[in-house]
Amino acid sequence: MDIDQYMTDLGRRARQASRAMARASTAAKNAALAAVAEAIERDAASLKEANARDVAKAREKGHDAAFIDRLTLSDKALKTMVEGLRQVAALADPIGEISNLKYRPSGIQVGQMRVPLGVIGIIYESRPNVTIDAAALCLKSGNATILRGGSEALECNTALAKLIGEGLEAAGLPQDAVQVVATSDRAAVGKLITMTEYVDVIVPRGGKSLIERLMNEARVPMIKHLDGICHVYVDDRADLTKALTVCDNAKTHRYGTCNTMETLLVARGIAAEVLPPLGKLYRDKQVELRVDAAARAVLADAGVGPLGDATEEDWRTEYLAPVLAIKVVDDLDAAIEHINEYSSQHTDAIVTEDHDRAMRFLREVDSASVMVNASTRFADGFEFGLGAEIGISNDKLHARGPVGLEGLTSLKYVVLGHGEGRQ
C-alpha cells in the first residue's frame, strides 16, 4: 500500500464530506447517531467476534492484563457506546447559533456564528469505545473526521466504521464524514499530522510518548494535553472533613487518569491536624507516600510509614499509579508558587473556608480547571455538563479544559446590513 497516496485520498474525501456536514440539519445528524446506535445493538455479536480476534492477537503479542482490559469490548462497553450515541443526539446542536449580535453606529449588526472546525483527525490507542465517542461528537458538531486507532483494535474499529457508514448513509449524510485508517502502518500517523491542506486539527488521545511524538512532528494544530500533574492544596483554614474527602477521592478514586492528584500540598499551620489521618488513609489503601522533610516529621510522629523521600523529580511526575508526593508549604503564596512552577496546567484544587483565599487561588493558578473544595476528578466533560468530551486540553488557545461539542467548533463574524457603505 502506498501510504502517502492512501492518506491523501482519505484527506481529500474527508474535506469534501466536511462541506456537506457543515450544512447538515440537526435532524439528519441525530438520525445518523440513532441509526448507528441501533446498528451496534443489532450487530453486537459480530462486533464482539471482531474484538475477540483483536484480543487474541494482543495476547499473542504479550500485552499485559491492563491493556487487554482496555481493548476488550464487553457487553457493558457496548451498552455504554449505545447510550453515549443517544446522549450526544440529545445534546443541543451548537452549529449555526448566532451570539453577541449588536447594532453599530453605522447601522449594521455584528455578531458571531458558531461553525464546525472542518476535518478533525483523532489519533488514539487501543480503546474501541473511542471510535464511537469521537465519531459521535464530530458528527454532531458538523465535522468530518479521520480516526486512527491503535493497531491492536484494527478489526473491531473497521467493523465499527462499517456501522457508522451505514448510519450516515441512512440519514442522507456522506459516509466519508467518518473514516477509519485501515492500516497499522505508523507512517499513516506521520502523514495524517502533516496534511494541513485537508486536516484542520488533530486530537490525540494516548500516552505521553505518543503526545511527545506528535508535538515534535505535527504541522496540523493540536488539541491536547501532555501530562496531568494535578495538585490539591489544603489551606490552614480548611475544613478537616472536606479536606479528607477531597484528598481521598482526588487520589484513590482512580489512579490511572489524567485528573488524579499527584502532589498534595499542606499548609504548615494545619499539617499536624490533617496529615496524620490522611497518611493513615493512604497507608490503608496501599498508596506509596513520597514526602518532604516537614511532612515526614509529622507523619512519622503519627506512626505512618513507610515513607519515601520526595525529590525534585517527584514534583514533576505524573505517576498514574498509587504513589503520592506530599509537601508542606508555608502558606497560600508558597502553594501557588509551587503549583505554577510544577503543574502541567491541567487541574488544581484548594481546600479552604476562606473566600478571599479561594478567589485568589482561582485567579492566580494558571491551569485549565481550578477548583475550590472539590476533587480534581471532577475535571471531566460529563461532570462539567458538556454531555461528553473528546479529550482535555491544557493549552491556552482555542479549547481549554474538557473539550465537548463547542470545543470542536469555531466562531466566525457575521454582519447584517441594509445596504450600508462605510463612511
UniProtKB/Swiss-Prot annotation:
MF (Gene Ontology): glutamate-5-semialdehyde dehydrogenase activity; NADP binding
One GO BP annotation of this record: L-proline biosynthetic process
Protein name in UniProt: Gamma-glutamyl phosphate reductase
The enzyme's E.C. designation: 1.2.1.41
Catalysed transformations (reactions): L-glutamate 5-semialdehyde + phosphate + NADP(+) = L-glutamyl 5-phosphate + NADPH + H(+)
Enzyme class: oxidoreductase
GO (cellular component) term, any one: cytoplasm
Function field: Catalyzes the NADPH-dependent reduction of L-glutamate 5-phosphate into L-glutamate 5-semialdehyde and phosphate. The product spontaneously undergoes cyclization to form 1-pyrroline-5-carboxylate.
Highest taxon, organism lineage: Bacteria
Gene this protein is translated from: proA
Keywords of the record: Amino-acid biosynthesis, Cytoplasm, NADP, Oxidoreductase, Proline biosynthesis
Pfam families: Aldedh
Main location: cytoplasm
Transmembrane segments: none
Subcellular localization(s) per the UniProt record: Cytoplasm
Pathway: Amino-acid biosynthesis; L-proline biosynthesis; L-glutamate 5-semialdehyde from L-glutamate: step 2/2
SUPFAM superfamilies in UniProt: ALDH-like
Family in the record: Belongs to the gamma-glutamyl phosphate reductase family.
